[in-house]
């Protein structure tokens, strides 16, 4: 191994997403996480490593990469990129209590104040710009009708000059490490980061952290917004756009799951995985705008 990580005592595969495979490595009583990127290009992984370095240099708490003995931060196995990061002590919870969600809101507000580097993508792979792809892979389906109806619904809000920032765009429970005393949180996994609408990130976090089954918990939404507003005050236009962008975020992830597991990487076990998020997007759309106020 080209790293100065010696005396390996344990390697354990971690549960994780479909985009990479993660292993917990123990050596010399220190823990590390090795991420093997199954589907990301070397260029994409290079940007991710640069982002982590950029975040740490700007005093945003997140993962820190480990360099090889000759200073490289990316290596390869079977032509697939690898990054090793220092393990962050803490826990991941499947459902977050309100006080933790408030901490995540505050951390998200801090993230949105980190200067966005020029190389940060200006769009997201599952954004509304790509919803039209449904015409190619799923024409004459009810899903096509649904996703294009959502696109029409959000169009008026895309013409507003809404603030953009360095966003995470994938803030679900699996990407948040909570300290043992539950007084701090660390946001990880910036693989989908972009320079995009702040309110999209807020909407995605509402979908990712504030949902309970088929509904969204309003008190959790309020907790997140209370934390966020400790760092950033929403503009009047963002206040108006929050509900549509929550719908947009839910639809975007629905689109990603539908396309990924039915067409790009067909998986019979996950073919209906998109429906839970579709239900949440519809739920958000059906609420009064007051639901998203705090």
Predicted regions span which residues?
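ATP/Mg2+ or Mg2+-diphosphate-binding catalytic cores
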Residues: 253-294
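Active-site acidic catalytic loop and adjacent metal/ATP-binding pocket
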Residues: 18-26, 33-34, 65, 155-200
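A glycine-centered beta->alpha junction motif in the catalytic cores
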Residues: 81-95, 131-132, 251-267
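Protein kinase glycine-rich loop
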Residues: 12-16
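A cross-family kinase active-site recognition segment
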Residues: 94-142, 162-164
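ATP-binding pocket architecture of kinase catalytic cores
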Residues: 27-118
């Amino acid at each position: 191994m080209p790293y100065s990580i010696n005396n390996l005592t344990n390697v354990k595969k971690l549960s994780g997403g479909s985009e990479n495979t993660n292993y917990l490595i123990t050596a010399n009583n220190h823990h590390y996480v090795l991420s093997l990127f199954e589907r990301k290009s070397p260029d994409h992984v290079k940007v991710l490593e640069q982002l982590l370095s950029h975040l740490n240099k700007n005093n945003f708490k997140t993962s820190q990469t480990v360099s090889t003995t000759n200073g490289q931060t990316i290596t390869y196995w079977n032509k697939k990129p690898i990054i090793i990061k220092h393990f962050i002590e803490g826990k991941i919870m499947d459902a977050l209590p309100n006080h933790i969600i408030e901490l995540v809101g505050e951390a998200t507000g801090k993230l949105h104040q980190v200067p966005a580097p020029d190389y940060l993508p200006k769009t997201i792979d599952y954004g509304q710009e790509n919803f039209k792809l449904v015409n190619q892979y799923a024409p004459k389906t009810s899903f096509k009708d649904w996703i294009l109806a959502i696109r029409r619904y959000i169009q008026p809000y895309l013409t507003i000059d809404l603030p953009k920032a360095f966003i995470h765009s994938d803030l679900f429970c699996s990407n948040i490490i909570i300290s043992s005393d539950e007084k701090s949180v660390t946001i990880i996994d910036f693989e989908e980061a972009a320079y995009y609408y702040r309110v999209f990130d807020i909407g995605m976090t509402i979908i990712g952290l504030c949902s309970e089954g088929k509904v969204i918990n309003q008190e959790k939404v309020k907790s997140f917004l209370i934390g966020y507003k400790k760092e950033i005050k929403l503009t009047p236009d963002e206040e108006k756009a929050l509900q549509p962008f929550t719908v947009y975020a839910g639809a975007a992830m629905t689109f990603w799951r539908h396309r990924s597991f039915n067409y790009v990487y067909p998986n019979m076990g996950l073919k209906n995985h998109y429906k839970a998020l579709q239900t949440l997007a519809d739920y958000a759309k059906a609420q009064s705008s007051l639901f998203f106020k705090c």
